[in-house]
Swiss-Prot record:
Function (record text): Involved in iron-sulfur cluster biogenesis. Binds a 4Fe-4S cluster, can transfer this cluster to apoproteins, and thereby intervenes in the maturation of Fe/S proteins. Could also act as a scaffold/chaperone for damaged Fe/S proteins.
GO MF annotation terms: 4 iron, 4 sulfur cluster binding; iron ion binding
Keyword Cell membrane: no
HAMAP family associated with the record: Fe_S_biogen_NfuA
Assembly information from the UniProt record: Homodimer.
Pfam families xrefs: Fe-S_biosyn, NifU
Protein's name in the database: Fe/S biogenesis protein NfuA
List of residues binding [4Fe-4S] cluster: 151, 154
Similarity comment: Belongs to the NfuA family.
Domain of life, source organism: Bacteria
Cofactor note (record): Binds 1 [4Fe-4S] cluster per subunit. The cluster is presumably bound at the interface of two monomers.
PANTHER family, A to Z: FE_S BIOGENESIS PROTEIN NFUA (PTHR11178:SF51), IRON-SULFUR CLUSTER SCAFFOLD PROTEIN NFU-RELATED (PTHR11178)
Alphabetic keyword roster: 4Fe-4S, Iron, Iron-sulfur, Metal-binding
Amino acid sequence: MSNITITETAQTHFANLLGQQPEGTNIRVFVVNPGTQNAECGVSYCPPEAVEGTDTEIPYSGFSAFIDELSLPFLEDAEIDFVTDKMGSQLTLKAPNAKMRKVSDDAPLVERVEYVIQTQVNPQLAGHGGHVNLVEITDDGIAIVAFGGGCNGCSMVDVTLKEGIEKELLNQFVGELTAVRDATEHDRGDHSYY
């Protein structure tokens, strides 16, 4: 069974929408290009004839959510919410594992660090058009990273490394990582954020 949360407000929203659809219509939650940097999540109507034998069905009050076999592991820990604020109402879908499958706690250190970088660090850097990649982890526990995009050449990269990335990684990998170092040959240009 998948660990997907659809909040009460989102369930009410879906039930209202589905009430205007043909009998037996449910919803489908899916990921296009799962496991890649181009992964995109979506929700669509799912008429009875579109249900596949390999789909996972998650029943809710008044409807079911169907998830295809390929999307399922990438929707682990996903949350669908319907939020109303002064700007209006919108459906939000957060799927932290859409771009990269969740790794187990006993996976090799390099896989666990890469997972945290891709799912927690890079989404924050993306707002500035930047990203960071793990180059290697040395024998003495130093994570070597390389910045790209808007982070390359940015005057704030040292602060981002020390106060953001290093603090986050050392906090999550106590006793396993000792430091985080930048291996980027920074080239300041129009692409640089600051």
